[in-house]
UniProtKB/Swiss-Prot annotation:
UniProt cross-references to InterPro entries, sorted A to Z: Erg6_SMT_methyltransf (IPR050447), Methyltransf_11 (IPR013216), MeTrfase_SMT (IPR030384), SAM-dependent_MTases_sf (IPR029063), Sterol_MeTrfase_C (IPR013705)
Gene3D superfamilies: Vaccinia Virus protein VP39
GO CC annotation: endoplasmic reticulum; lipid droplet; phagocytic vesicle
A family per Pfam: Sterol_MT_C
GO molecular function: sterol 24-C-methyltransferase activity
Lineage: superkingdom: Eukaryota
Classification via PANTHER family: HYPOTHETICAL LOC100005854, ZGC:194242
Similarity section: Belongs to the class I-like SAM-binding methyltransferase superfamily. Erg6/SMT family.
Enzyme nomenclature, EC number: 2.1.1.41
Name of the molecule in the record: Probable cycloartenol-C-24-methyltransferase 1
Pathway involvement of the protein, from the record: Steroid biosynthesis; sterol biosynthesis
Organism listed in the record: Dictyostelium discoideum
Reactions it catalyzes: zymosterol + S-adenosyl-L-methionine = fecosterol + S-adenosyl-L-homocysteine + H(+)
């Protein structure tokens, strides 16, 4: 069996998992439509009151989002739920791995180090970074479904000795002060209700002199809050990705400083990419890449609809797929207008006590 055949086999197994409701999917049930509608209620407005409501309910909001989206993400994107810069002639999979290894390189990871991945998803980046660096990586996640899925993937990859999980809210990590040598997050802390509060918690658990790196989702400085078209793109990105409120680069930097970190570097990595970061959402030539295209997403939707009709999928799976397709459309629009980026890179240091 060649690589493409193995990839296709894995993809087909995951589209069945979209709806088979694996036994460890704690918060899942057959009322997918009700869950999706309840999630959408949190995004009825975009004024300060509505944004605050999303922040107040962020744990429920984010868990609901990932209960709905995880299997679709893994089927159409892979085990690493993030974007990446991309060079000409570089495959999508290679760009994703390089993006993760760049983080490990910037943090200076090596065997024996103890590192925490803030908001680790099903652990794709964690496994890449553990393989690349030899460091012990602990994945922090508050979604039980993703953790159970990630544990199986760790075991399958032969990395259970280097990769593990903690189930907890990243605003309240149940570990002692100065526990980890380094910390990182890849497109995860955009879900935080209070960025300063989150960064303070990361500051607390990292050892003095330790580094914290992250890829943040931002509205770039080109975003015009007075332009209704751009405001709608922002709102739709937030709705489609379980976010309380997207901010500009200065707020990211100021939050890190307010938490006590020394900011080493901060820049939008997307500006260094030879190919647009959103290219996988609009084109692709591999089997996996095809699933990212408009045609691929359409066919995925039709197959999901068929599963509903023959009762292999609960009602609402098709609507969930349509909702995620819509989210992809607005991510592309934000990228094309250069008003949104999912990879504002921030590297900070916790001051040494010396």
């Amino acid at each position: 069996m060649n690589t493409q055949q193995r990839a296709m086999e894995g993809d087909l197994s995951r589209i069945v998992a979209i709806s088979r409701k694996e036994k460890d999917a704690v918060s899942r049930n057959d009322k997918v439509d009700d869950t999706l509608n309840g999630y959408k209620e949190l995004f009825k407005g975009n004024d300060d009151k509505a944004i605050q409501a999303r922040k107040n309910n962020y744990t429920h909001m984010v868990n609901t989002f990932y209960d709905l989206a995880t299997d679709f993400y893994e089927f159409g994107w892979g085990q690493s739920f993030h974007f990446a810069t991309r060079h000409k002639y570089e495959s999508f999979e290679a760009s994703i791995a390089r993006h993760e290894m760049y983080m490990a390189h910037q943090l200076g990871l090596f065997p024996g180090m103890k590192v925490i991945d803030i908001g680790c998803g099903v652990g794709g980046p964690m496994r890449t970074i553990a393989r690349f660096s030899g460091a012990n990586v602990v994945g922090l996640n508050n979604n039980e479904y993703q953790i159970q899925r990630g544990k199986r993937l760790n075991e399958s990859a032969g990395l259970s000795h280097l990769c593990s999980f903690i189930k907890a809210d990243f605003m309240h990590v149940p570990v002692e002060d100065n526990t980890y040598d380094c910390a990182y997050q890849i497109e995860a802390t955009c879900h935080a209700p209070d960025l300063v509060g989150l960064y303070k918690e990361v500051f607390r658990i990292v050892k003095p002199g330790g580094l914290f790196g992250g890829y943040e989702w931002i509205m770039t400085n080109k975003f015009n809050p007075e332009d209704p078209v751009e405001v709608n793109i922002k709102k739709q990105i937030e709705l489609g990705n379980g976010l309380p409120d997207l901010v500009k680069p200065a707020e990211i930097i100021n939050a890190a400083k307010a938490a006590g970190f020394e900011v080493i570097t901060a820049f939008d990595v997307a500006e260094t990419s030879e190919l647009p970061w959103y290219l996988p959402l609009s084109s692709g030539v591999s089997i996996t890449g095809f699933l990212h295209t408009g045609v691929g997403r359409y066919l995925t939707g039709k197959f999901t609809q068929l599963l509903e009709i023959v009762k292999l999928a609960p009602a609402g799976s098709y609507n969930t797929n349509v909702w995620l397709q819509n989210a992809a459309t607005f991510l592309v629009q934000g990228g094309e207008k250069q008003i949104f980026s999912p990879m504002f890179f921030l590297l900070c240091r916790k001051p040494s006590t010396d």
